From Swiss-Prot:
Family stated for the protein in its record: Belongs to the nitrate reductase family.
Assembly mode: Homodimer.
Start and end residues of each stretch annotated as Disordered: 1-65
Gene source species: Nicotiana tabacum
Free-text cofactor note: Binds 1 FAD per subunit.
Enzyme class of the recorded protein, top EC level: oxidoreductase
Chain residues that bind Mo-molybdopterin: C183
Superkingdom in the source lineage: Eukaryota
Protein name: Nitrate reductase [NADH] 2
Entry EC no(s): 1.7.1.1
Record lineage: Eukaryota, Viridiplantae, Streptophyta, Embryophyta, Tracheophyta
Encoding gene, per UniProt annotation: NIA2
Length: 904
């Protein structure tokens, strides 16, 4: 081992600072409003040493700029909530790592691949707090200690060596600089909306900038005596410590040309600090590669070996990752024709890119006397690769016919070699009326080599380096009656989150291309030949129980005579009456139901010349734009006391999540306004709506919170994981989606739905008819306990309601019983009015005092009241339970199941 070049003590990591950074007062990232979470204190380590060998100048105000920079790091950290051991990591190899809960997980629970919410990333500006830095992990995070870790330099070098971490810090000069890291898959979800790639759904926040400190790679290679090119030293390979499944089992590895590694202008370092602290586990602790201007995939984390070779890295991940193949090459062709091994398709340097971040997705700009008197400021970020400076960013409001040049903010100074390693920010003021008359906003950037972004997306099998114009769609909406605003839509939302104009367009394309049972040929025997045409305004008039029309795939159906027969109850139709419910219908109905619908078709929708209240309609084509603006009124804050709006979806924010057991979670969702109640009558349910795997998914749930909770509602949900139940190998779509939702994300809610409403003191409204009971036989199976629980909760909350409740609750195992603690508590405190009996298929616990098996006549006779004119049976559970256990056994007891059985 070589001797130390310097003999200095190193008992701690010094709080490193970057080269100078002085944010402009007019920076586009200023003034962004973002709520501050619980703060955590930033601890500045003592004896800070500043290294400025990479500065572009020797300005006297460097110290002031460095101090200002330290304050930026401190401010960023103070606005973060503490990182925690996330329950989603339980049962994985990463359960020891603390992470920020707001990070959006893109690949389920494990491995951890995530990006921050875009607005939160931009709130912090130039420097990203480490917990919000995007993460790309191919597998579990390797565990290692500072004292035991070594980095080996070997291969075509004169003196192969292993260096400890202390040697890397003490024996070499350090280099410290801000670098923007970008995953090559940034904006990949846009590509997946066109055609599925082999990669997961990165949004537009797979980009982050932090301050990195480490040893210049060239210094390590020089110490070891790297051979010359003539002696075969052509490539420098990097190998990490993570053991991965690719290629039958291998380490993550890649390589770069030796000329790059030895070029001082490229600032390549073996890094051990980030933002003045040791590396976080997800970012490569204790040491990793940083290669400015390159894609993140070349910057190997948890670096163990640096090998100088003649050939490129032979790692599976060097060839089967980070390539841009021609659009006609799919995964099968790439494998059969060995496209992976063609050197011309490898990705090294980043390409030019830009993104619109303000307006954010689903932001609504009210149009009123105040907003129209001042410009609206568009904002975003841009970057390029190879150290090239972004020289201009342009915005178009007319599809590229004309462009406006934005104001650029480059917070970094160039290095002494003239390189720019970081993102910059752009801003542009536009008139609100110009926005109102536009269909979309698009942005493109240029760098100093006059590279710019293509107009259209160019698909490739890995979905990498997507840099087409970033487009934000705009539509006129009506937040309140008689008032308008502009709602903005980004192309996608990251991961499996729903939303984005590309998802809507994809859904429409799939609907048009798929074989439609609703679009039958004229020769079809049961073809409804109705050809009458109706306008949207005419359809809207038919939104009541007296006349309920719906639109599905452009066809109009009169569902009035089907209201009473609909399995989901009258409300399920009425909530969509007078609207286009294509998405909702496709999401929850079978092909059989679609065929049945054909009997109710009365005509077709006129698709031109009508206006819709839907945000999906623009004001384009209006013959008199000024007349359209005439009725604009100043918007006022919403004063609604009830959140649910029939026929509309409302966005609700996930604010808390608790694990009750290994597969049961309690979710708390905030309502749109803090002073609202949900507005769900007791006995009814809501639909949760999300786009999962490019399709709208809607599932019914009953909240477990009381109806008068203000500002939020709660759900207790059993998670049906993939690969657990043989009959359902893919698990539950919505429950798994809920489990993967990060705090702070939104879910659409629609309701109220259902044909049963408990009105108090034993009174029910069922299909519009009154029913009364003094005693309730409540039979539930599995998650069907939630509507029963809701009714019980309402009864027990009213001191004047003396209704008696007899609960028989069936589950597969004891562990599957939901809300058991609450049910047992009620039965214990009020035994004269609440009686609870459990039935499980099998019991493995000693002391089980309840029934084992299935619900039988004997069990019901013993634990529910005899039928009478003041007794009603309530049931909710799987259809087989209702059909084979509830209905026949109640009939044997003498219940009139047509009149006295209410099935939720």
């Amino acid at each position: 081992m070589a001797a130390s070049v310097e003999n200095r003590q190193f008992s701690h990591l010094e709080a490193g600072l970057s080269r100078s950074f002085k944010p402009r007062s007019d920076s586009p990232v200023r003034g962004c409003n973002f709520p501050s979470p619980n703060s955590t204190n930033f601890q500045k380590k003592p004896n800070s040493t500043i290294y400025l060998d990479y500065s572009s100048s020797e300005d006297d105000d460097d110290d002031d700029e460095k101090n200002e920079y330290l304050q930026m790091i401190k401010k960023g950290n103070s606005e973060l909530e503490p990182s925690v051991h996330d329950t989603r990591d339980e049962g994985t190899a990463d359960n020891w790592i603390e992470r920020n809960f707001s990070m959006i997980r893109l690949t389920g629970k494990h491995p951890f691949n995530s990006e921050p919410p875009l607005n939160r990333l931009m709130h912090h500006g130039f420097i990203t707090p480490v917990p919000l830095h995007y993460v790309r992990n191919h597998g579990p995070v390797p565990k290692g200690t500072w004292d035991d870790w070594t980095v080996e330099v070997t291969g075509l070098v004169k003196r192969p060596m292993k260096f400890t971490m202390d040697q890397l810090v003490n024996e070499f000069p350090c280099r410290e600089l801000p670098v923007t890291l970008v995953c090559a898959g940034n904006r990949r979800k846009e590509q997946n909306m066109v055609k599925q790639t082999i990669g997961f759904n990165w949004g537009a926040a797979a980009v982050s900038t932090t301050i990195w400190r480490g040893v210049p790679l060239r210094a390590l290679l020089k110490r070891c005596g790297v051979f010359s090119k003539n002696k075969g030293a052509l490539n420098v390979c990097f190998e990490g410590a993570d053991v991965l499944p690719g290629g039958g089992g291998s380490k993550y590895g890649t390589s770069i040309k030796k000329e790059f590694a030895m070029d001082p202008a490229r600032d390549i370092i073996v890094a051990y600090m980030q933002n003045g602290e040791k590396l976080a586990p997800d970012h490569g602790f204790p040491v990793r590669m940083i290669i400015p201007g390159f894609i993140g995939g070349r910057m190997v984390k948890w670096i163990k070996r640096i090998i100088v070779t003649t050939q490129e890295s032979d790692s599976y991940y060097h060839f089967k990752d980070n390539r841009v193949l021609p659009p006609h090459v799919d995964a099968e062709l790439a494998n059969t024709e060995a496209w992976w091994y063609k050197p011309e398709y490898i990705i090294n340097e980043l390409n030019i890119n830009s993104v619109i971040t303000t307006p954010c997705h689903e932001e609504i700009l009210p149009i009123n006397a105040w907003t129209t008197q001042r410009p609206y400021t568009l904002r975003g970020y841009s970057y390029s690769g190879g150290g090239k400076k972004v020289t201009r960013v342009e915005v178009t409001l007319d599809g590229g016919e004309t462009w406006q040049v934005s104001t650029l903010d480059h917070p970094e100074k160039p290095t002494k070699y003239g390189k720019y390693w970081c993102w910059c920010f752009w801003s542009l003021e536009v008139e609100v009326l110009d926005l109102l008359s536009a269909k979309e906003i698009a942005v493109r950037a240029w760098d100093e080599t006059l590279n710019t972004q293509p107009e259209k997306l160019i698909w490739n099998v890995m979905g990498m380096m997507n840099n087409c114009w970033f487009r934000v769609k705009m539509n006129v909406c009506k937040p309140h009656k008689g008032e308008i605003g502009i709602v903005f839509e980004h192309p996608t939302q990251p991961g499996n989150q729903s939303g984005g104009w590309m998802a809507k367009e994809r859904h429409l394309e799939i609907s048009a291309e798929a074989p439609q049972t609703l679009k039958k040929s004229i020769s079809t025997p049961f073809m409804n030949t109705a050809s009458k045409m109706y306008s949207m305004s005419e359809v809207r008039k038919h939104s009541s129980a007296d006349s309920a029309w719906i639109i599905v795939h452009g066809h109009i159906y009169d569902a009035t005579r089907f209201l009473k027969d609909h399995p989901g109850g009258t409300d399920s139709i009425l909530i969509n009456a007078g609207t286009d419910c294509t998405e909702e219908f496709d999401a929850i109905h079978s092909d059989k139901a679609k065929k049945l619908l054909e009997d109710f078709r009365i005509g077709e929708l006129i698709t031109t010349g009508y206006t819709s209240d839907s945000p999906g309609n623009s004001v384009h084509g209006s013959s008199s734009f000024s007349s359209f603006l005439a009725p604009i009124k100043e918007l006022v804050p919403a004063q609604r006391s009830v959140a649910l709006i029939p026929r509309e979806k409302i966005p609700c924010k996930l604010i808390d999540k608790q694990s009750i057991s290994h597969d049961v979670r309690k979710f708390r969702f905030a309502l749109p306004s803090e002073d609202q109640v949900l507005g769900l009558p007791v006995g009814k349910h809501i639909f949760l709506c999300a786009v999962i795997d490019d399709k709208l998914c809607m599932r019914a749930y009953t909240p477990t919170s009381t109806i008068d909770e203000v500002g939020y509602f709660e759900l207790v949900v059993k998670i049906y994981f993939k690969g657990i139940h043989p009959k359902f190998p893919n698990g539950g779509q919505m429950s798994q989606y809920l489990d993967s939702m990060p705090l702070g994300s939104f879910l659409d809610v629609k309701g109220p739905l259902g044909h049963i409403e408990y009105q108090g003191k034993g009174n029910f409204l069922v299909h519009g008819k009154q029913k009364f009971a003094k005693k309730l036989a409540m039979i539930a199976g599995g998650t069907g306990i939630t509507p029963v629980y809701q009714v019980m909760q309402a009864i027990l909350k009213d001191p004047e309601d003396d209704t008696e409740m007899y609960v028989v609750y069936a589950n597969r195992t004891e562990d599957d019983i939901l809300l058991k603690e609450e049910l047992d508590s009620w039965a214990e405190k009020i035994p004269e009015r609440v009686k609870v009996w459990y039935v499980v298929q099998d019991s493995i616990k000693e002391g089980w005092k309840y029934s084992i098996g299935f619900i039988t006549e004997a069990i019901l006779r013993e634990h529910i009241p005899e039928p009478s004119h003041t007794t009603l049976a309530l049931a909710c559970g799987p259809p087989p339970m209702i059909q084979f256990a509830v209905n026949p056994n109640l009939e044997k007891m003498g219940y009139d199941i047509k009149d006295s059985l209410l099935v939720f």
